[in-house]
C-alpha cells in the first residue's frame, strides 16, 4: 500500500490531471478556431509606416515578390480582399529591400538577464513581454531578431506563457538539464529548444523537477 503523505500524493495526482486537461483544452480550442499561429497581422499601409520603408517601397516590393510566386497573407473584408501581412511577410519585405538585419550588423547575441530572488516582482511578465516586444514590435521588425528564452525558474511560468504543452508534468529537456549534461549546440537545437506560438521566439523549458537540482547538486556532478 502506497503512502500518500497526508493526502499530498492524491492532491498532486489531481493537480497533474487538471493541468493536463487544461492544456489539452486550450490546444483543442486553438485548433478548432484556427488560432494556432500568432494573431497579429499588419495592413499594407501599416507596413509602409514602419522604419526604413515607404508606401512606394512596400507596393513595389509586394509586386516584385508576388510576380516571383511569393504568397502574402490576406483576409476577406466584405467583397474585397485586403493584405493581412504576418511578421514573416514583413521580415521578407525587408529582406527583399536588402535592409540589413541585426545579425548582419553585430557579432554574437545580446543577452538580457532577468533575475530576482523575491517572488511576485514580474520576472515572468517582464521576460515574456520583452521577448514578444523585441520580436514583433513594428519598430523592431527590420532587425529580424531571433529570440531564445531560457527558463531557469522551476515554476516554469515563462514556459507556460510561451509553450504550455512543454510546461506540464515532468519535462526532461530543460535548461537545468542542458547545463548539467554539458550539451553541444547541435543537441540543444535538436532536443532542447522548443518553438512557441510566435515565429522567431523559442524557449528552453523549465520543469518543477529542476527545483531538486540544488539539493542534489553534489550527487549530480560527482
Model-identified regions with their sequence ranges:
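Short coil turns linking two alpha-helices in DNA-binding domains
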Residues: 52-61
